[in-house]
Amino acid sequence: MDFTASDTARLTGISVRSINTIYIKLRQKIAIQCEEVSPFHGVIELDESYFGAHRVRGKRGRGASGKTIVFGLLKRNENVYTEIVPDCSKATLQGIIRGHIELDSVINTDGWRGYDGLVDIGFDKYFRVNHGNNEFACGERHINGIESFWGYAKKRLMKFNGIDKKMFYLHLKETEYRFNHRHDNLYLDLLKLLRKNPL
């Protein structure tokens, strides 16, 4: 799935339509696997990122309209979990945090106000880095891991020269799966996955 459907069709002699069908089914299996996440425990980094066409002049970050917002949780030096969200409000982000992170975890975020009140809901070990004040790391207080994942994801998805919004979720989950298995033999991992859940 490193090639576009057109390139794969050209290499194999199979129609683009058939290749697309196979790719979609594979990505659906991968997405199901990615959604079977246990609650994260340990040192966790949280951040949001915006995916979509190049920015419109003057619009950046949280004000960028028309972009897909993705919220990410990364267990430091291990796995990432991503979720497409409608907004970056406190209610949205904290709902996901409560459902995916154990209370005694150490949480690191940037200074976004959507994270206000995490201590009030039981996350006592909560630390921030304030990017607005040019603070990016203070010892173990940083979100460099999740920001590294965003760079990896954007670079990987860029090679497709645009992804249909309806298909973005599946491509995102494939990227998440690849990142989480970056030290493994991806081919063997996919074979195990398909043995367990055939197409």
Residue ranges with predicted function:
Residues 1-199:
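Residue-level recognition of single "structural anchor" positions
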